[in-house]
Amino acid sequence: MNFRISDTFTDSLARLTTDEQKAVKTSAFDLQINPAHPGLSLHKLDRAKDENFWSVRVGSDLRLIVHRTAESLLLCYVDHHDKAYDWASRRKLETHPKTGAAQLVELQETVREIVVSRAVERTAYTPTKPALFREMTDSVLLSYGVPTEWLAQVKLVDEDSLLDIADRLPAEASEALLELATGGKPAPRVAVPGGDPFAHPDAQRRFRVMSNVEELERALDSPWDKWMVFLHPDQRQFVERDYNGPARVSGSAGTGKTIV
């Protein structure tokens, strides 16, 4: 079984107190060593839209949300009981239908709330601002990694609601929409149909396999961007390519040549 953590888990862990973090880390180590440990009190979340979400009891009130299948155990989120359950009820783990990348996706009800709330904030004297992506086809939006669940709402987004939506989208989709909104032309995401959704370059930005306790300890003791060397998918293709001899990477300033 592959043991993974997500950036949403490390972000939520960082918001807890020091003592709470220690308790959560202990449970995470126990899960990695023995996911069937009887003392972990795993509970299936029957009301979650994703049938593979489970909670792990950490003390009297903290709950660790995990995504559990026969092949994988993914640490997704941690918080106090009600907040943890609410987080799980609003999300599901999906494989993007066009890019093949694994994504933790917020449900449509949440997305609609953002667009509607921005609309009601406007006064009767405020001109209606144009939707930024109304003319874009579903196929094009999907090629940027926008989840299917979000297509209709993304087409309603104007400049006032763009940042709210972008904060809740997977990174590759968020970056593409922000670039489009500023006049850019982002490249479509790399499609890996039929492959391991967690091995996709975009999925590697948010999910990582923990091979041993030492690696997990490093991951939990530092912010996500500190312990993980992140390569943008455009950089990764140069790093992982096989060359017959010396190779030169060229590009304008700020394109990531030094990191490669």
Predicted regions and their residues:
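Hydrophobic, helix-prone linear segments
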Residues: 1-29, 40-43, 66
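Short coil/loop residues immediately preceding or within conserved phosphate-binding loops
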Residues: 53, 226, 244
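Walker A/P-loop
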Residues: 243-260
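Pre-Walker A adenine-sensing motif
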Residues: 226-241
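Conserved adenine-nucleotide phosphate-binding loops and their immediately adjacent elements
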Residues: 205-228
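Interdomain "pre-motor" coupling segment immediately N-terminal to P-loop NTPase/helicase cores
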Residues: 151-213
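A short, surface-exposed loop/turn module that caps and links secondary-structure elements
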Residues: 29-56
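Enriched for short, Lys/Arg-rich terminal
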Residues: 58-158, 162-165
